[in-house]
Design a protein with these regions (language model features):
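N-terminal pre-domain and mature-chain start segments
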Residues: 1-395
Length: 395
């Protein structure tokens, strides 16, 4: 990807399934300024008296210049233009845990925030997904014998890793650094990825990184620990700890979770709640096939936070696969009625994360929304953070 350092802001959203694209050319700083636009199959060029902006498209995306249509001027945005594209649908979603390659390997679990080793050289023989929350009902409906696993939680053995919607379940060994607090478990309904254990809230069940003091997960029993995907990086032991900016990691993990769940369960609405049980965000997936290409993203008008500065620096002239979602914040008593309605709707899935991570995610969504052209930021009463990336940037 390449873009000139000066010129007009160019925003291009490519929809792979629809083979179409929306092009937004930002308003010039001075009204009435002339603008020359050149569109070729592999590039976009915008010339103004201030300078030239050029985008080189990724190899898998080609524009159809003759299909340009729907030209209109939107105050605050600039020019909107639609055109057809030829885009390969080769954006494969990388699983949160590559079962085929990482099973049978010695892996090390790191704290994503600081790189502290949480579990060292653990050989994972079985890497298995936990069943969905409805599996118990399906067994009763389709099987002629009683469910032998009713009300029995699934405890991973020493070399197991069970994968939930937003967490890993691993078995604690005596040589693990994490202390084992006393627990107060209550009766379990059915072991599942969403409702695997019911515990009375107790401060000493938290798993805390001893270096940076970030909450990594929760101790579920004397041997079983839940580690949240947003807080942990699992690597083969022969590899070094990968340094990934925090905001990039969080939105990538959450977007992967959302896409996998929406594909597996045909659900597109989610509540994001903290480990304290409070709902922080309502999310509604619009699509997951977008490729966003942008140049000259201005961050002057965006309030900067240390969590996001790494992304603000790297976003000029970039392309990335994205999940487009609608969201509503539910903090400080906002959207209480809507949140209650969503919580009581059985078709809406819940994701549980550490409460601090929920606030990080809300900040990321707000920042992503603020970088969109103004006319694309809202749909009805929801906000639209389109650049919710789920894979590495496209180069």
């Amino acid at each position: 990807m390449g873009a000139a350092a000066a010129g007009t802001r160019v925003f291009l959203e490519v929809r792979r399934r629809l083979q179409s694209a929306l092009l937004v050319l930002g308003e010039p700083k001075e009204g009435g300024m002339s603008m020359d636009i050149s569109i070729t199959p592999c590039s976009l060029q915008v010339k103004t008296p201030e300078g030239c902006t050029e985008l080189q498209l990724p190899a898998e995306v080609r524009l159809v210049p003759s299909s340009c249509g729907g030209l209109r001027y939107v105050p605050g945005d600039g020019l909107h233009l639609r055109l057809q594209v030829r885009a390969e649908s080769n954006a494969k979603l990388v699983s949160m845990f590559n079962q085929s390659s990482q099973a049978q390997e010695c892996c090390t679990f790191y704290c994503q925030s600081c790189g502290e080793v949480i579990i060292r050289d653990r050989e994972l023989i079985r890497v298995l997904p936990l069943p969905s929350e409805n599996w118990g009902a399906l067994v009763e409906e389709w099987c002629c014998h009683p469910d032998p696993f009713a009300n029995k939680p699934l405890h991973p053995q020493e070399n197991d890793c069970f994968i939930g919607d937003s967490f890993f379940l691993v078995n604690l060994r005596s040589d693990l650094w994490q202390p084992r607090p006393e627990l107060a478990p209550v009766e379990t309904c059915c072991p599942s990825s969403e409702n695997h254990f019911k515990l009375k809230p107790k401060a000493n069940t938290k798993v805390i990184c001893k270096r940076c003091k970030v909450m990594l997960g929760e101790t579920m029993s004397s041997e079983t620990t839940k580690l949240y995907m947003t807080e942990i990086i699992i690597q083969p032991s022969e590899r070094n700890f990968p340094i990934i900016p925090r905001s990039q990691f969080v939105q990538s993990v959450i977007a992967q979770c959302l896409v996998e769940l929406s594909t597996a369960r045909s659900t597109f609405r989610f509540t994001v709640q903290g480990h304290d049980g409070k709902v922080y965000i309502l999310l509604w997936i619009l699509n997951s096939d977008s490729l966003v290409i942008e140049s000259l993203r201005s961050s002057k008008s965006i309030k900067k936070f240390s969590l996001l500065e790494d992304v603000l620096k790297a976003d000029s002239g970039s392309a990335w696969n994205a999940v487009k979602v609608l969201y509503q914040p539910c903090i400080k008593s906002r959207n209480e009625k809507l949140s209650s309605a969503w919580e009581s709707d059985i078709s809406i899935h819940s994701l549980t994360l550490p409460s601090a991570t929920c606030l990080e995610l809300l900040l990321i969504l707000s920042r992503n929304n603020a970088t969109l052209p103004p006319s694309l930021r809202y749909m009805n009463s929801f906000q639209v953070p389109i650049n919710f990336s789920y894979r590495a940037r496209v180069t």
